[in-house]
């Protein structure tokens, strides 16, 4: 009867669960972290190390987190945790953006506008309470992602200390000469009832009426002279303009031409029984005339825009208004007519050129900007022909204005077009340019633009194209409108002179005093402040500014309110946000940083793409393709979500679908199963007693430690370069190829069959221990919950958390003078592949059932054969085959042949050996198994 030798084998055993069961297990781990105060422990453990500060860009405190939030926070968490392992102290202070319109709107829905049920003080308090509620909701979601940070002490832009530091930051901007006031055209949202900054604008397709309008010459002969021709008495002369905003025509005060553009005097369509000659850019004349129904191009003269400067035209429906011809750099001959109607109250370029010609001094405010903050024409707006404009909304009035132009013969062409148009990012409604008194950070007054462009060169940009993107934005951007006409925000704490409008000469000092009061009592103190408390007898001459600061200024000065205020220093090592933040937080932080310190507030900027479905479509409720992070965590676990984020190419759009999640769950299982196999084979291993020195290891074990060292160097470099996708690929490849298909497969024989405390087995366990120690660290930034779980199962004494350590130092490269060095292993593994190819057809035709049933012959040149012959008896373990013979050959190529074995099979190790049955007490065992069961055990040197 056969004996049962199962009890003589060292089979794997571990309590580390095979199933991750992450949705159930992760909350318990999270609760333990909270109870032990993990974040503070991390900081305490890292005290004295060099700082690495990833500064958190504040999400808006409104609503549950979405997938984009999860991507952002998890990428940050991966980087921060990798910095702890790299030997840094890496504080992470999460923050929230708490002021602004969305919160005002939410409060208005419940309580009405200011003055309805609540006064301004009560309204601000409700806004504060609402924001705090939203923060508490989002904080739970963020923590569930496994993000470790100072959640008990985050920064909030609504906190009194932050609001005070924001006013102090503004005082530095003032001190450095960057703040200006003026009635410039700014983006204006009728729904917000406020000015908008560049960062609050998004472009969407919109249909607009495109019209060509004739501005008749006041003196046709004067224009003819500019062209060097005499104009017949029965000919009218006009300058056509092309616009997509007919509503701005009541504000039209001039027509701009390009000084260096060539213009022609062309025969146009007749008007009121008279011929009409039109002034058109030469490059556009033919196309324009086709729009007007004129088939033949007939030219009467040619000149430049400079020659037409200061000519006078008639407004198309305000006959008493003289329209001056200007020269402007903004005019081109790429589209339209080459002439631009100029409404300084509704266009930035129009404003600049009108200011240059002194037009703003000739007209009152109602003529320059005839619409109010709701988009309604002022009562002072004259009618257009018979059409009353006063009290009408501009969008509704457009059709009537076009009708007036058609009736009086000024309309040369009309057709609707679809084009990209600025919209409010909150309301998704079209915005306009509207000149109102605002506060600006000037881009050029104190050289801010040039200084900011220079600062961009000092920053590392990931991906590299981010640099060119933000450069072009800063280079072309207008002054930054930082004032808002709203209630919930940090006040622009300035006193302006009632007569001159100038700010108080001691403004910087006064702002510091206001900030001290705000720090103690909050922003309401500004509104209740009696000016005499600070200004004394001067108070009667000054008034308080009632505008509040743009929320982009709030978040833009977090380098002052957080980095400087909390002692982290400036600049931060890294800012990391979505790719839309080149025009948002990256830029507002850059401008305030340069305005205050003359340097960028960050050393590096990293951007990630947006999430899309597997077809590249933006995720939305209407398409039904949205995936919520909460659903992923409840079904699969946060570590699966984290693995997807790490494995995706975040520099582009990040695709997610249920199939992609399934693939990541499969990848997670591969990683977990590898870790479990390592732990299972470390059963009974105590590194304090059993760890073998590297130079005493079996050669294969020493080689796998070398491979792990090589891998760790690549992983460290990838973490340093924020290349998480490469790390995931390296890990999966190592688990599948180096371990799964090779090392773990080969060493099973040694681990299972050799005596428990034999050198060969302890050597393999030592290698696995080194790999398990390193592996847990490698995955810790990404699989934060699983690494914590793994850490608790590693043999030996350990620190309280994997992140209390640094990268594993038990790995080392294989010396070049080792008996089998890395090159030797490359050659042997190439032979192993040849063996597998030779055995494949033998398996297919039934000659063998398994590789152990084949005997291998290797023919190699004499030098190679001489090197491999001493290994021959152990090569069968590397190849997982029957006996191996090495023979010298006259060729430089290596040849492998195989034949089925005729030797008996050992029931314990399954190898076919000639000595099976020689021991009478164990007739079914081979000689080495007899030795391993009853004697001193076999000796392994190589594999």
Swiss-Prot record:
Please list the residues that bind Zn(2+).
906, 909, 926, 929
Query: What stretch of residues is annotated with the motif 'KMSKS' region?
Result: 618-622
Q: Which CDD domains match?
A: Anticodon_Ia_Ile_BEm (cd07960)
Q: Which cofactor does it need?
A: Zn(2+)
User: Keyword Aminoacyl-tRNA synthetase on this protein?
Assistant: yes
Q: Where in the cell is it found?
A: Cytoplasm
EC number, as in UniProt: 6.1.1.5
Entry's Gene Ontology molecular function annotations = aminoacyl-tRNA deacylase activity; ATP binding; isoleucine-tRNA ligase activity; tRNA binding; zinc ion binding
Report motif location: 'HIGH' region. Answer: 59-69
Give the residues the record marks as binding L-isoleucyl-5'-AMP. Answer: 577
Q: Which BP terms in the Gene Ontology apply to this protein?
A: isoleucyl-tRNA aminoacylation
Q: Enumerate the catalysed reactions.
A: tRNA(Ile) + L-isoleucine + ATP = L-isoleucyl-tRNA(Ile) + AMP + diphosphate
Q: Name one GO cellular component term.
A: cytosol
Q: Which InterPro entries match?
A: aa-tRNA-synth_I_CS, aa-tRNA-synth_Ia, Anticodon_Ile_BEm, Ile-tRNA-ligase, Ile-tRNA-ligase_type1, Ile-tRNA_ligase, M/V/L/I-tRNA-synth_anticd-bd, Rossmann-like_a/b/a_fold
Q: Which Pfam family is an annotated match for this chain, by its short name?
A: zf-FPG_IleRS
The entry marks the following residues as binding ATP, namely 621
Cofactor detail note: Binds 1 zinc ion per subunit.
Query: Which Gene3D superfamilies does this entry report, sorted A to Z?
Result: 1.10.730.20, HUPs, Ile-tRNA synthetase CP2 domain-like, Valyl/Leucyl/Isoleucyl-tRNA synthetase, editing domain
Give the protein's biological function.
Catalyzes the attachment of isoleucine to tRNA(Ile). As IleRS can inadvertently accommodate and process structurally similar amino acids such as valine, to avoid such errors it has two additional distinct tRNA(Ile)-dependent editing activities. One activity is designated as 'pretransfer' editing and involves the hydrolysis of activated Val-AMP. The other activity is designated 'posttransfer' editing and involves deacylation of mischarged Val-tRNA(Ile).
Record note on domains: IleRS has two distinct active sites: one for aminoacylation and one for editing. The misactivated valine is translocated from the active site to the editing site, which sterically excludes the correctly activated isoleucine. The single editing site contains two valyl binding pockets, one specific for each substrate (Val-AMP or Val-tRNA(Ile)).
What does the similarity note say? Belongs to the class-I aminoacyl-tRNA synthetase family. IleS type 1 subfamily.
Name this protein carries in UniProt: Isoleucine--tRNA ligase
Protein source organism: Stenotrophomonas maltophilia (strain K279a)
The opening ranks of the lineage are: Bacteria, Pseudomonadati, Pseudomonadota, Gammaproteobacteria, Lysobacterales
> Encoded by which gene?
ileS
């Amino acid at each position: 009867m056969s004996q049962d030798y199962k009890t003589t084998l060292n089979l794997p055993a571990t309590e580390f669960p095979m199933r991750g069961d992450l949705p159930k297990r992760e909350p318990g781990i999270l609760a333990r972290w909270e109870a032990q105060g993990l974040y503070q422990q991390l900081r305490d453990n890292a005290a004295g190390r060099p700082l690495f500060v990833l500064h958190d860009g504040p999400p808006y405190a409104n609503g549950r987190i979405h997938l984009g939030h999860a991507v952002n926070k998890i990428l940050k968490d991966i980087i921060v945790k990798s910095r702890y392992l790299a030997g840094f102290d890496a504080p992470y202070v999460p923050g929230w953006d708490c002021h602004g319109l969305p919160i005002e709107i939410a409060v208005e829905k419940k309580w009405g506008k200011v003055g309805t049920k609540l006064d301004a003080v009560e309204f601000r308090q409700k806004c504060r309470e609402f924001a705090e509620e939203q923060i508490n909701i989002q904080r739970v979601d963020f923590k569930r992602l496994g993000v470790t940070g100072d959640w008990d002490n985050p920064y909030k832009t609504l906190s009194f200390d932050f609001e005070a530091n924001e006013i102090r930051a503004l005082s530095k901007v003032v001190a450095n000469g960057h703040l200006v006031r003026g009635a410039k055209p700014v983006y204006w949202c009728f729904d917000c009832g406020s000015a908008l900054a560049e960062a609050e604008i998004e472009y969407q397709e919109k249909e607009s009426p495109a019209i060509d309008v004739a501005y008749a010459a006041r003196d046709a002969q004067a224009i003819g002279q500019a062209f060097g021709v005499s104009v017949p008495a029965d000919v009218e002369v006009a300058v056509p303009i092309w616009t997509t905003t007919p509503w701005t025509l009541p504000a039209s005060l001039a027509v701009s031409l390009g000084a260096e553009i060539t213009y022609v005097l062309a025969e146009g369509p007749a008007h009121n029984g008279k011929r009409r000659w039109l002034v058109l850019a030469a490059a556009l004349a033919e196309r324009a005339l086709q729009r007007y129904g004129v088939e033949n191009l007939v030219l009467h003269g040619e000149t430049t825009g400079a020659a037409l400067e200061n000519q006078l035209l008639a407004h198309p429906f305000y006959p008493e208004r003289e329209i001056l011809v200007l020269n402007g750099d903004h005019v081109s001959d790429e589209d339209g007519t080459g002439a631009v109607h100029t409404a300084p109250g509704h266009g930035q370029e129009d404003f600049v050129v009108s200011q240059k010609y002194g037009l703003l001094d000739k007209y009152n405010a109602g003529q320059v900007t005839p619409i109010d903050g709701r988009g309604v024409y002022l009562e002072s707006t004259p009618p257009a022909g018979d059409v009353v404009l006063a009290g009408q909304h501009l969008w509704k009035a457009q059709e009537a204005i076009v009708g007036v132009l058609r009736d009086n013969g000024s309309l040369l062409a009309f057709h609707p077009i679809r084009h990209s148009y600025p919209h409010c990012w909150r309301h998704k409604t079209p915005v306009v340019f509207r000149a109102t008194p605002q506060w600006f950070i000037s881009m050029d007054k104190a050289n801010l633009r040039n200084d900011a462009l220079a600062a961009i060169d000092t920053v590392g940009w990931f991906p590299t194209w981010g640099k060119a993107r933000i450069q072009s934005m800063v280079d072309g951007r207008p002054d930054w409108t930082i004032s808002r006409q709203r209630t919930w925000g940090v006040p622009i704490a300035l006193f302006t002179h009632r007569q001159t409008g100038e700010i108080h000469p001691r403004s910087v000092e006064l702002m510091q005093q206001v900030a001290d009061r705000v720090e103690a009592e909050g922003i309401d103190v500004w509104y209740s402040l009696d000016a005499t408390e600070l200004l004394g007898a001067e108070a009667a001459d000054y008034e308080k500014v009632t505008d509040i600061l743009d929320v982009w200024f709030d978040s833009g000065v977090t380098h002052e309110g957080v980095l400087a205020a909390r002692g982290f220093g400036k600049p931060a090592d890294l800012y990391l946000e979505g790719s839309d933040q080149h025009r948002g937080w990256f830029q507002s932080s850059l401008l305030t940083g340069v305005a205050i310190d003359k340097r960028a507030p960050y050393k590096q900027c990293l951007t990630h793409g947006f999430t899309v479905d597997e077809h590249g479509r933006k995720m939305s409720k209407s398409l039904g393709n949205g995936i919520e992070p909460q659903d992923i965590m409840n079904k699969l676990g946060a570590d699966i979500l984290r693995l997807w984020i790490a494995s995706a190419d975040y520099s582009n759009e990040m695709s997610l679908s249920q199939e992609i999640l399934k693939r990541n769950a499969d990848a997670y299982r591969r990683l977990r199963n590898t870790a479990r196999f390592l732990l299972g084979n470390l059963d009974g291993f105590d590194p304090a007693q059993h760890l073998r020195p590297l130079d005493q290891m079996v050669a294969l074990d020493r080689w796998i430690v070398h491979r792990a060292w090589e891998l760790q160097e690549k992983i460290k470099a990838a973490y340093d370069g924020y290349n998480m996708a490469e790390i995931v690929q390296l890990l999966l490849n190592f688990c599948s190829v180096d371990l799964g298909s090779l090392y773990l497969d080969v060493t099973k024989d040694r681990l299972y069959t050799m005596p428990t405390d034999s050198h060969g087995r302890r050597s393999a366990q030592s290698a696995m221990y080194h790999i398990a120690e390193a592996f847990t660290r490698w995955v810790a930034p990404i699989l934060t919950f699983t690494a914590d779980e793994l850490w608790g199962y590693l043999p030996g004494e350990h620190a309280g958390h994997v992140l209390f350590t640094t990268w594993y130092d038990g790995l080392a490269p294989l010396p070049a003078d080792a008996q089998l060095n890395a090159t030797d292993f490359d050659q042997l593994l190439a032979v192993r592949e040849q063996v597998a190819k030779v055995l494949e057809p033998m398996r297919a035709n039934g000659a063998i059932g398994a590789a152990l049933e084949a005997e291998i012959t290797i023919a190699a040149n004499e030098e190679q054969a001489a090197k491999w012959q001493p290994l021959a008896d152990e090569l069968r373990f590397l190849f997982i085959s029957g006996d191996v013979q090495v023979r010298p050959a006259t060729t430089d190529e290596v040849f492998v042949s195989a034949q089925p074995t005729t030797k008996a099979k050992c029931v314990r190790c399954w190898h076919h050996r000639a000595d099976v049955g020689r021991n009478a007490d164990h007739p079914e065992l081979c000689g080495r198994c007899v030795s391993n069961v009853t004697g001193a055990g076999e000796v392994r040197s190589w594999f």
